[in-house]
Amino acid sequence: QLATSYETMFENEGENNVESVFEVQYTDAEGAGFGCLQCSEGNVAVGFNGIRNHTGPTYDSGYSFNVPTQETVDSFEDGDSRKEVSVLDIEAWAEQTGATYGLGYEHTGYYNRKYIPRKGDQNIGDQNLTNPNNYRSIRFADVLLMHAEAALETGDLSTALTNVNIVRNRAKSSKRT
């Protein structure tokens, strides 16, 4: 089944929830280093997705890789709650909170909010290399959308629309007909 709240889906408290089909489990156990990234028991990607030189509330700093493009941001429909969960507009965030940050390589003004390090999540010994945030590989929403695609390919438009609209309803997006 779908989790009732998408807002906490990618936070630590949303790990292994009712919607989770498969998550890569991570811990904050120390052991990683740039000479041995494979030694990490934590999610290295979180540190790489973080805001470069961030100083402010909620988020810790990172390396500013894997940033969303304007095209990605524009692909969300008005009212789609997944946009705020998925994308952080760093300029709006800085204006709202007084946070400061540096410009990373290929700066777009946006960050992958799902996987920005949160204050208190990082293991100090492995700064940015050992984050306990699980990677949500397959969620039930993904299964519904895969089933919708398979149904569409076999000519079952009704099932395809039903499954797409289940996911869209949770995101508070308009139904497809």
Residue ranges and their predicted role:
Residues 140, 147-149:
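Structural register within alpha-helical repeat arrays
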